[in-house]
Amino acid sequence: MAVVTMRELLDAGVHFGHQTRRWNPKMKRFIFTDRNGIYIIDLQQTLTYIDEAYEFVKETVAHGGNILYVGTKKQAQEAVANEAERVGMPYVNHRWLGGMLTNFQTVAKRLHRLKELQAMDAAEDGYKGRTKKEVLMLTRERNKLERVLGGIADMTKTPSALWIVDTNKEHIAVSEAQKLNIPVVAILDTNCDPDVVDYPIPGNDDAIRSANLLTSIISSAVEAGRQARAERQEAAAKEAAGDADKAPAEAERTEAPAEEAPAEAQSEAKAEGNTEA
């Protein structure tokens, strides 16, 4: 079954690129034609690249990896948050903090601080003994951290891969991922550089419907990866149980000749006695 159909891509406007005067020549191979000063992306290629990205994400998750969703532009914020939350993956949809990957230890300290503030707010007596001004300052600090780091609050290590909507907008995230050899899966509009992406999906990164559709496909791959992982674990458990059941039977077969040994010895003794007679 196809991951997505050509009709779905067309309906979402995935084929619309940027104006012909705003383009990256490296994207030429992904362009089908231009119409009224707008580049039209070759959706046949898009379908092929979607399949490749889907399989990569699926296998990454199947092996226990996680995907960090990144999209801070207005058109991508809702899709990134909704789809990441749907499949329980971390996300950044407001502002990318420099060093979020390359200096994750420092970010982890801020995450710890965020959890402290959240626990304080959740406790009945969390603000006991503090003035109204102090409570206000702590609340502002918590809100700021939640806005910037809320999507990665449960992330304990750097991600296995990134899903990015608009690599130009998220160029810092792309650069950090490259430094750490973290694979990047991303929508490539006609003004993007395909050389910085490991698993490109040629498409419209400005339209909300396009961002929604392509991000939902990545989430479907995450779900498929989780299912594959569960199936593999179940198969491994059954195999281990089967090996455990075989062990006693093999032990019994190994002990059987020892039990038969006395009878064989008696037969040999009788034979020797008859010979002497």
Curated annotation (Swiss-Prot):
One of its GO terms (molecular function) is structural constituent of ribosome. One of its GO terms (cellular component) is cytosolic small ribosomal subunit. One of its GO terms (biological process) is translation. PROSITE patterns: RIBOSOMAL_S2_1. The keyword Ribonucleoprotein applies. Residues 227-256, 267-277 have a biased composition (Basic and acidic residues). Keywords: Ribonucleoprotein, Ribosomal protein. SUPFAM superfamilies: Ribosomal protein S2. It comes from the Bacteria. Coiled coil: none annotated. Residues 227-277 are annotated as: Disordered. Belongs to the universal ribosomal protein uS2 family. PANTHER family: 30S RIBOSOMAL PROTEIN S2 PROKARYOTIC AND ORGANELLAR, SMALL RIBOSOMAL SUBUNIT PROTEIN US2M. This is Small ribosomal subunit protein uS2. It comes from Corynebacterium jeikeium (strain K411). The lineage of its organism: Bacteria, Bacillati, Actinomycetota, Actinomycetes, Mycobacteriales. The gene is rpsB.
